[in-house]
Amino acid sequence: EIMPSLVGSEMCIRDRYKVNYSLSGASIPPDAKTFSVAYFPNNAPMVAPILSSTLTDALRDKFTRQTRLTQVDEGGDFAFEGEITGYTSTTASVSGSSETALLNRLTITVNVRFTNAVDESMSWKKTFSAFEDFDSSKLLNEIEGELIPQIVDKLVTDIFQASAANW
């Protein structure tokens, strides 16, 4: 006799409280319906021609593929804007004996402003940075077409997690 009442109680509790499950790590509030991503201009001192469009498109694609939100041109319930502020190549490691660079590091830094129209307290402004190391025998312009998408993927994952995984 106890068992039916426990099952009934569980059903009442389950029906009363809605829980969002997601394989992507996103937990978007039910009231959020749309998202918008403004073009991210490259304001870094050193500019890579493909970077702005690669970053902007990757962020749009991430939200399209991994959420139920519909993309709009501007004013989405989740709205992203910002700019690329850093694109730098530095020495990552050197040979101890000859002081020769073994690896170089390409680092991309992005300022992002996220507006959550459903819950303003969840809005934020943050700086994200990611990098990839590459063999110092290669010139940056030879390898950046391969490195930029890898770094952008890291940045987009971090931005996505910061905005959609906090619920």
Language-model regions: role of each:
Residues 4, 42-46, 138-146:
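Short coil/turn segments at secondary-structure junctions
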Residues 7, 29-31, 76, 122:
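A short, polar/charged loop/turn motif at coil->beta-strand junctions and beta-hairpin connectors
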Residues 14-57, 61, 68, 73, ...:
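A structural "domain/chain start" motif
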Residues 23, 64-70, 77-123, 132-146, ...:
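Surface-exposed short loop/turn segments
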Residues 126-128:
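Short hydrophobic alpha-helix segments
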Residues 144-167:
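Compositionally biased, intrinsically disordered linkers/stalks adjacent to structured regions
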